[in-house]
Design a protein with these regions (language model features):
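Short, solvent-exposed loop/turn segments at secondary-structure junctions
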Residues: 29-33, 86, 110, 156-158, ...
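N-terminal small-domain helix-loop-helix segment of the aminotransferase-like
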Residues: 3-84
Length: 264
């Protein structure tokens, strides 16, 4: 059995506020409807001359182009499409972890992600945040104590704290994970919420240990209903994931991928 903690109730309250028309909840990471590219999407739909099919490969190529602008050099063979980052995280857990394994994440963890770990019987160890990201001294202590299978992090605008991990700390995190041979799952779906300053390179872009699995989604920055996310990793991982989630891919929206392809 499990129970809802006070923090989980707080998150539920934050998200319920997002549904009220009179307020925009900054805590729920739900954009104001007016900020979505509604006119652009409507134009794409009006000009659609065929039923969208086989959009997945075009989607992967477009994602490669987007990531190239972030100094991430990947091919379509390094990409697996999913509906959203929660699904990506769940599939990675299914593939790599067994009940009783440990994963380290930044504190606090949003309830949706905490539920993924809990439902799979994974022990979640959290590390406190500092103004520039995860407390790396406490992270190393946790690594030595629990021997985790993964480190899960959101270096850009961590949900829910909004903290951005500094460039120096990103480099140290990669060195620390490399020293202990622990893979990193980097979720980067909030990276476009920057309003000032320069965008910092992702962990994946700086990774010389080939230890980072990168997950991202267009869900937060594109209208709801167009759910397309992706996993970036080594080709052997992607090939295994393809076999694992071939059934789920049947339900990925070709229309949503078509709209994204045209918009990108």
């Amino acid at each position: 059995r499990y129970h809802f903690t006070d923090k989980e109730k707080l998150f539920l309250d934050i998200f319920s506020r997002s549904e009220r028309e009179e307020c925009i909840s900054m805590g729920g990471i739900i954009m104001d409807d007016a900020a979505y590219p509604r006119e652009g999407v409507e134009k794409i739909l009006q000009n659609m001359s065929r039923e969208p099919r086989n959009e997945a490969e075009r989607m992967k190529k477009n994602i490669c182009s987007v990531l190239f602008q972030e100094n991430m050099y990947v091919s379509p063979k390094n990409i697996q499409l999913v509906a959203e980052t929660n699904q990506a995280l769940s599939h990675i857990m299914t593939l790599y972890l067994e009940e009783g394994d440990y994963v380290i994440a930044e504190e606090p963890v949003v309830p949706d992600n905490a539920s993924i770990f809990r439902n799979k019987g994974i022990n979640l160890v959290t590390v406190p945040m500092e103004p520039d990201g995860m407390d790396l001294a406490k992270l190393e202590t946790a690594i030595r104590k629990y021997a985790p299978k993964f480190i899960y992090t959101m270096p850009n605008y961590h949900n829910p704290t909004g903290i951005v991990m500094s460039l120096e700390k990103r480099k140290k995190l990669l060195e620390l994970a490399g020293r202990y041979c622990i893979p990193i799952i980097e979720e980067d779906s909030q990276r476009d919420f920057r309003y000032e300053g320069n965008r910092l390179p992702s962990l994946y872009a700086q990774d010389r240990y080939r230890s980072v699995i990168y997950i991202d989604s267009f869900t937060l920055t594109f209208p709801y209903g167009i759910k397309t996310g992706y996993i970036v990793g080594p080709t052997d991982l992607i090939e295994t994931l393809e076999r694992l989630i071939v059934v789920d891919e049947t339900f990925v929206s070709s229309l949503g991928q078509y709209i994204l392809n045209e918009y990108i």
